[in-house]
């Protein structure tokens, strides 16, 4: 009888020891929340690059330092490091930089736990199309977040003037292909492929996705805020 009681007590103590750690791990991953995530993409018919504009309504669930250190600022994934014209479009952004995996954003001031703020930026993304004869195809997945939930996300792909694309998913309104998601869990993605059979120019295969220079390569990006 004593052995049974001792075994039961040891089991309860083990559960009690593990439970706080499990609860803490689950809670610690949710240090931010994204209320709204909007992405607008427009291909350039001359060189095949993508003009991308991203807008966030973001909430800090913990105090968020302004600078991008281990827990400051934010970082958002990009497809590869060959980008140009990276531009901050909102006043709260103090600095914006990139490497092959992320855009890193520093803010002009800290944000307190519970504070909601908005920011946006844009860039031109290169080496994104593939060629199959006269067909031009894009596959694009906006940065996702393994440690942050997203309330609402909209990806809008704008066909260039005079060109009509076929999207792999979502709804099409005129020349806009719209893909939406709500209540996105950790790590959930919103990929979209768009194919053009009537591209008006001859794009150079040298600048296609298949020929991305090794110095810009990013075979996998795991997006999260810092």
For the regions a language model picked out, list residue spans one by one.
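Bacterial N-terminal signal peptides
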Residues: 9-21
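Positively charged n-region of N-terminal signal peptides that target proteins for export
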Residues: 1-5
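Lumenal/extracellular ectodomains and adaptor appendage modules
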Residues: 23-226
